[in-house]
A protein has these predicted regions:
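Bacterial N-terminal signal peptides that target proteins for export
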Residues: 1-10
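Hydrophobic alpha-helical membrane-embedded or membrane-associated segments
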Residues: 12-15
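N-terminal signal peptide c-region/cleavage motif recognized by signal peptidases
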Residues: 18-20
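Residue-level hotspots at or immediately adjacent to binding/recognition sites across diverse folds
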Residues: 23-342
Length: 342
């Protein structure tokens, strides 16, 4: 089982710098027939293809959900997230501040950023037209506005608590070297970045939630009165659903002004969410897939092996799952009715 400690490991750069950083040459991922049965952390669609990422630099591609081809990947670190701009251009994040790019639908990947000396993983990435943002531990924030051709790293000081912001302002003026060192660990882990309508949302540790316009400017903190970590947020109709540790799932019907706890019935950390046309899925530890048809009643499907479910996507009447024990699929018919809970 992937416990909270493992999720926190997954959740474990200077202003205005344009970069492509490769401080040292990494080791390329090895091809393995067992890759589809090993830890996978995220899965998405590139056109009609399934593409999944996971441990040891594994990236897997499938046309039919049955046969999986392993991509050529120049790193062997734990990969954490994947997203595509179109059928061909996509991006992957991972540990050692790894950022990869493909231009051929995921078959071959090149390094955009690789900085093991930072000791900070990138945890999530989202692509919206030409705007690409990757986030990670201790407020790591990398952005491209030209579909990944050039990148900037920035420190989002508007997301600091007030005391920390004032402290850093003083350091910046009188002790600039200390300022650079101190600010490296002042922001919380940014666990996920999510596109909701014309806004971006970052969910993170210690109850952190913030949003901005779709360009990633003018970030504002949203208070939630919860101090555990969040890992995903999704909007369904007029409601925001915010997911985190120990099965905590919160609902807001007033754009984040107030939140109330929904009953998932199981204290399993929710790792990510996916919204289909009729069903919203929440993928969780201990084999749990929470789902809702009405944004209120939370149902639960449990994998027989009890392995953590990290992410999922729907294709051709199946939900394809990235799990602790590899890629699995479940018919969407398993998620079509509300189930009574005691």
């Amino acid at each position: 089982m992937l416990n909270t400690m493992f999720k926190n490991i997954l959740s474990i750069m200077l202003v205005g710098t344009v970069f492509t950083a490769v401080a040292q040459q990494p080791t390329a991922a090895m091809k393995s027939k067992l890759a589809p049965k090993q830890l996978m952390t995220d899965i998405t669609l590139a056109g009609s293809k399934l593409v999944a990422v996971g441990e040891r630099g594994h990236i897997l591609i499938s046309e039919d959900g049955e046969q999986w081809q392993q991509a050529n990947v120049p790193v062997n670190v734990l990969l954490t997230s994947i997203d595509f701009k179109n059928d061909n251009v996509g991006f992957v994040t991972g540990h050692d501040a790894t950022l990869l790019k493909t231009t051929d639908g995921g078959l071959n990947w090149s390094i955009v950023n690789y900085q093991p000396e930072l000791d900070k993983p990138l945890l999530d990435i989202k692509v919206l037209n030409n705007n690409v943002i990757a986030v990670g531990a201790y407020g790591l924030f990398l952005q491209s506005t030209d579909a990944g051709e050039t990148w900037q790293d920035s420190f989002q000081d508007e997301l600091l608590i007030e005391d920390d912001r004032l402290y850093l302002e003083e350091l910046k003026e009188f002790e600039p070297d200390t300022y650079i060192k101190e600010r490296q660990y002042m922001l919380p882990h940014f666990n996920s970045i999510n596109v909701i309508g014309e806004e971006l949302y970052i969910a993170g540790e210690a109850g952190f939630l913030a949003n901005s316009d779709v360009n990633g400017a003018d970030w504002q903190v949203i208070e939630t009165d919860y101090f555990g970590s969040y890992f995903s947020i999704v909007k369904v109709e007029d409601s925001l659903l915010l997911a985190g540790l120990r099965g905590n799932l919160f609902k807001s019907e007033d754009d984040g002004e107030s939140w109330r706890l929904l009953n998932t019935g199981v204290k399993a950390t929710i790792n990510s969410a996916f919204k289909d046309s009729q069903v919203t899925y929440f993928f969780a530890n201990s084999g749990n897939v929470f789902y809702t048809l009405d944004n209120e009643v939370i149902n639960n499907y449990v994998l027989d092996d009890g392995k953590a479910v990290m992410a999922g996507v729907v294709l051709n009447n199946f939900v394809y799952l990235a799990t602790e024990a590899g890629i699995k699929k479940v018919p969407t018919s398993e998620f079509t009715s509300n189930k009574a809970r005691d």
